[in-house]
A protein has these predicted regions:
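Extended active-site neighborhood of metal-dependent phosphoesterases/phosphodiesterases
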Residues: 6-123
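Active-site-proximal segments of metal-dependent phosphoesterases and phosphodiesterases across multiple
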Residues: 122-152
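Active-site-adjacent substrate/metal-binding segments within catalytic domains
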Residues: 1
């Protein structure tokens, strides 16, 4: 058994020791190989970090830790939204040999709704997204690029 609860506590204490804000995203390694703690439990630990900017997010969305950080200026104008998405664990069957999971449609829909609302206030706003595993489209683009497709 892997004591990922203890590791999460130690990680949070370590990051808090720098006294600067930090965040994280979940991926496929957080609860694998006999880990003792699920993502929901890890999220509760991370949410307690003194300098952590982290939330478990909405329960109805696939994954844990889907949230948006709005970087603003002194007047409260959003300069850069940071989107953090759980790229989840493994595909059908739920374990390593079943293939990797992905960012799901409900997560994408939620993300776009949030960004559309920000764009309604300021059409020039751009966002950055952070997640552990790249979307399948990255692989498709990479393969096209290797074959010489300059449109990628």
């Amino acid at each position: 058994m892997r004591d990922n609860r203890r590791q999460a506590i130690r990680f949070t204490e370590f990051m808090d020791s720098f006294a600067i804000p930090y965040t994280m995203v979940f991926g496929n390694h957080d609860c694998e190989m006999g880990a003792t703690c699920k993502k929901e439990e890890l999220a509760a630990i991370y949410e307690q970090g003194r300098y952590a900017i982290f939330t478990a997010g909405r329960e109805e969305l696939t994954g844990v830790g889907n949230f948006l950080i709005e970087l603003t200026d002194a007047a409260g104008q959003v300069l850069l939204p940071l989107v953090l998405l759980d790229s989840n664990m493994y595909g059908e069957g739920g374990w390593f040999y079943s293939g990797f999971d992905r960012i799901h449609e409900d997560q994408t829909r939620w993300c776009m709704e949030r960004l559309d609302a920000l764009k309604a206030q300021d059409p020039t706003v751009r966002a950055m997204a952070f997640f552990h595993m790249p979307p399948r489209e990255f692989k498709e683009a990479y393969e096209k690029m290797k074959l010489g497709d300059r449109a990628v």
